[in-house]
Swiss-Prot record:
Pfam families: MMR_HSR1. It comes from the Eukaryota. GO terms for molecular function: GTP binding; GTPase activity. It is found in: Plastid, Chloroplast. CDD domains: YlqF. This is DAR GTPase 3, chloroplastic. Coiled coil: none annotated. The lineage of its organism: Eukaryota, Viridiplantae, Streptophyta, Embryophyta, Tracheophyta. In contrast to other GTP-binding proteins, this family is characterized by a circular permutation of the GTPase motifs described by a G4-G1-G3 pattern. The DARXP motif is also sometime designated as G6 region. GTPase that may function in chloroplast ribosome assembly. Keywords: Chloroplast, GTP-binding, Nucleotide-binding, Plastid, Transit peptide. Residues 1-33 form a transit peptide.
Length: 372
């Protein structure tokens, strides 16, 4: 659907941008196993999160241009604390990196194909819109007309949709929320792509050229739903699509009617992901290959995140798994679930938790909030 905003009762000033932070916290403690991998093992030593962290952050937002201060509300502080904690938690973990060989080849081809595109459709995961955009995206697109699609809109709340719509609207970016599985928003996306590139044939006529189809490229990270959207637009399965990263490995142009050509492209990731908090979120949302991460590490971080997100909380974790979260230690929670349900297999327990999240078993959960 198009981004439709609910009325906001108290809009904040446009230039609120400065922050004064005062932070006190008891840090998590981490222990890295001293055991070494065996000769037959390609995995690094196992890493265990041992302790929890209790953080208290007071934030005052200041707008120097208008001379007054605004207190950040409790929800904003909670999210800022959580983002800070995620970065702390990931320091002890093996870095999450995934760059299969076909991506380098595809990146070169994509830059060439961009020259042919009238409009570019960037698809992101609505649960983590900031973590699912390529750092080179703006440089690649330049001044080309652009549509931002936040897919999996069925997995976030109406409030989250409104907040993200406001955030991107302020940047002048056209946003459509879609559900690639059910096709919601897909046809509206096709109409918008045609309308944005409507002047293409007008210019061609002025030059005495025949009209041609509008060319729209669909690009984005792995497994964010690019191929599924194309299949919904075409109303038949033309592009290979599956709920895992790396299925699409080659670029493919397909026709939508007489006047729109669509380019399906493989998921594009940077060669190195410097922001490991973002990398963990990619792993949680299944937007990066499974070989890139340790399931128990990622599930442990997810448990700690869910416990801190108001829409979920430790109570929801207990109600689902009948396990108390002790000391905000997600790794211990995963291990206990493994003992209770899977004969001590922590990997299977981690897989269950991640699968439950990916299937929406915890309700509408966004793992990111728009920056203040």
């Amino acid at each position: 659907m198009f981004a439709q905003l609910a009325p906001s009762p108290s809009p904040s000033p446009a230039n609120v941008s400065h922050f004064v932070h005062r932070r006190t916290f008891r840090q998590c403690t981490y222990a890295v196993s001293a055991s070494l991998p065996t000769a037959n093992s390609s995995r690094p030593p196992p890493i265990q999160i041992v302790g929890g962290k209790d953080l208290n952050l007071d934030v005052t937002r200041k707008d120097d241009s208008i001379g007054f201060k605004l207190e950040a509300n409790e929800d904003e502080i909670d999210w800022m604390n959580l983002e800070s904690d995620i970065r702390l938690w990931t320091r002890a973990l093996r870095p999450v990196q995934w760059y299969p060989g076909h991506i380098m080849k595809t990146e070169k081809e994509l830059r060439e194909q961009l020259k042919l595109m009238d409009v570019v459709i960037e698809v992101r995961d609505a649960r983590i819109p900031l973590s699912t955009t390529h750092p080179k995206m703006d440089a690649w697109l330049g001044n080309r007309k652009r549509i931002l699609v936040l897919n999996r809109e069925d997995m976030i709340s109406n409030d989250d949709r409104n907040d993200w719509a406001r955030y991107f609207a302020k940047q002048g970016i056209k946003v459509i929320f879609t559900n690639g599985k059910l096709g919601m928003g897909a046809m509206k996306l096709g109409r918008l792509a045609k309308s944005l590139a409507g002047d293409v044939n007008g210019k061609r006529r002025e030059k005495g050229l025949l009209p041609r189809s509008v060319r729209a490229g669909i690009i984005g990270y792995p497994n964010v739903g690019k191929s599924s959207l194309i299949n919904r637009l075409l109303k038949r399965k033309i592009c290979a699509a599956a709920p895992r990263p790396g299925v699409t490995r080659e670029m493919k142009w397909v026709k939508l009617g007489k006047d729109l050509d669509l380019l399906d492209s493989p998921g594009m990731l940077p060669m190195r992901i410097d922001d490991q908090a973002a990398a963990i979120k990619l792993a949680i949302c299944d937007d990066i290959g499974e070989k890139a991460y340790d399931f128990t590490d990622v599930a442990g971080i997810l448990v700690q995140m869910l416990a801190r997100i108001p829409e979920v909380g430790a109570k929801a974790l207990y109600n689902r798994y009948k396990i108390q979260l002790e000391g905000n230690c997600g790794k211990k929670f995963v291990k206990t679930l493994g003992l209770n349900l899977f004969g001590g297999d922590s990997h299977q327990a981690a897989f269950r938790i991640l699968t439950d999240f990916r299937k929406g078993k915890f309700g509408y959960v966004s793992l990111e909030r728009p920056p203040l």
